[in-house]
Amino acid sequence: MIKKLIVNADDFGLSEGVCLGILKAHRDGILTSTTCMMNMENIEKYLEMTKAYPNLGLGVHLNITVGKPLTKVSFIDEKGNFKSRDTYKNREAIVLQEELYQEWKAQIEKFIKIIGHKPTHLDSHHHVHLLKSNRDVVLKLAHEYDLPIRQETYLQKDFEPVYFCLLYTSDAADD
């Protein structure tokens, strides 16, 4: 059967509540896919929970704006965390391409090591893969791993995004 609609939730791994909400939306709703933040502290534990949902597509949510890097990079703050998304407001912030390539490759490889197969697709936290300075890196990785990229060009439209946020606890996910 060909998938006609993919409904994807970003940020799997950001927190337990986010992960439980995503799993509940898949189990009880129309969510078909999620993308995983591989540099988050408890990602192994959270990915273990996905084994109960074999029809949930799992991609990698490439990240350079939250948490600690998996590799040695220069685009970190004084605490060793990635610089915030505000660093990239002008959409042209300079990141060393080889460092970016190694970091994102490490995130993909960590996913493969934990899950045992390649991800379904790539996208990125705060859409940083769409920055001109980062586009070649994500395209190179997509080609290397033979993966689709969600939204490979930046939309230039006048619209207001709508954000939905639900607070889930471990009790709520079992409802």
What residue spans do the PLM features occupy?
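Active-site beta->alpha N-cap acidic-glycine motif
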Residues: 1-67
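Active-site mouth loops of central-metabolism enzymes
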Residues: 6-8, 91-101
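Alpha-helical structural signal in soluble globular domains
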Residues: 25-28, 49-53, 110, 114, ...
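Generic structural signal for well-ordered alpha-helices
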Residues: 43-47, 104-108, 122, 135, ...
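Active-site gating loops and adjacent loop-to-helix segments of metal-dependent hydrolytic enzymes
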Residues: 69-96
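CE4/NodB-like, metal-dependent polysaccharide N-deacetylase domain
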Residues: 99-121
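Hydrophobic, aromatic-enriched interface-forming segments
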Residues: 119-157
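Conserved small/polar residues in nucleotide/adenosyl-binding loops
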Residues: 168-175
